[in-house]
């Protein structure tokens, strides 16, 4: 069977993702884009089997233009390593594409996006999903879970469970890694093990990556972003 058609499809998806990436940088459908340095789009194989969706970029992500590179991202990378996964085989993104924060002195402190802000970003996320076509998704935290499932999600009672989105895709709900950073230090080890147990439920979907060779036929989505900070409004 010829590989030309799948290769063309991958190239088209990569081009479309790149265009979406550029478009999110210009997005002003909510006020967050006015204050952020830049948008932070997803990155990973164009047709990754498993997509991981977080809440929003943090301070470091906002400056570097890449998802999950701050403290929560390092914790996520540690979990990926312990599970025997490779981040290069995951498509990682956020439900909200711009950093929401409040200034405290010279520090920019994370603020949870309002539902209207997440809703304004939903079409970007839906477009990513349509192009990447993951078999399964992991929702890290309540904002991501609500965006994917279209309803409020009680993360603590629904974590470690598979749910179906409107298109019938499987969505695993668990905590955002930042919740582990804020948690009770005495419970940190137990919380870590419980989080790993949640994530491990997605291992069958991850392991199926090896049989989906077409993901390696195109370069990963994502781009090198500028590092200059936009002055806060």
Model-assigned labels for residue ranges:
Residues 2-233:
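A polyanion-binding, active-site-adjacent surface
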